[in-house]
Amino acid sequence: MIRKEHNEFTRVQLPAALHLTRLGYDYLSATSEEIKNRDYSTNILLSIFKRQFLTFNNYASEADFEREFENIRLELEQDDIGCSFFNRIHADSGYTYINWDNIEENTFHIALEVTCQNGEEEFRPDITVFINGLPLSYIEVKQPDAIRDGKTGINSEKERTKLRFENKKFRRFNNITQLIAISDNLPYDDSQGQQFQGSFYCSNAYSGTKFNSFKEEQERQVQSSLSSLTEEMIDLVLKDVNRFALKSQAEFRTNLESASPCNSFLTSLYQKERLFFMLRYGLVYVEERDKKGQIQLQKHAMRYPQYFATKAIERGLEDGIKKGVIWHTQGSGKTALAFFNIRYLR
């Protein structure tokens, strides 16, 4: 009799990784040359990053690449929650790192549990997302209904994420990461007035990290954009992690469904067009006063109502509408929406 595994790896992590392949991400094994030969101080996949850099900047030399790469490593050590690197990938350095205008010219990869290590301290995100070899996002998953010390898995992960942001040993990894997502593959439940379960995303921050839900308003449209999950891809991943026996288990097949809470969330946030929108227009650095009254740089991510409002305004403008009214509820982020609108629509 085959023993069934019921843990976050089999119930959420593997199904999530396989779902990302539906969205067009290529899977990298931990034993692949790209992962083994990465820059361990930043987790940049050197072979992919170099190839893409020299393709986008075909006038650049090998020496130019080496110089720019060293500049990135130095920038990621700065105490600026990644602001310098953020400006760099938005072409402020004079070089192109991401082709923002033609998404398919970029490469998209995922890998499981790539270690982020500095000295004796380390953490391993469940899934790391690489664009052109740059680890710009990661995803942490929790087992559904896992309660420890009176806390749900989501609440524990939120606290763990905040502690990582405060750890100077992890500065390079924090600064290069643009978006973090967490999920326990459960539907949202706000009945107790707090977000104890579900799927959330955030950007890195010094303090007061804000975790945002994503409640899809275009379900049919985004689901129709998914490609099929092939048996060959399932076999490849399960064999790679030595879990091929899962393939015949009914629960695993259920967790692979594209409409599961975690997978639906990943579609909403990691569909390539959506992710590029968030990375290009949905992140902002602002100076705020901390609890001591000191000015502190913070980073915020666009919330889902602001995203859908921005896209609705765009559709209205395309239809020739010149004026109108945007209705807001209290605390819905009117000022931030105005900023994001101007950045995107100008």
Give names to the regions the model predicted.
Residues 2-346:
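ATP-dependent helicase/translocase motor core
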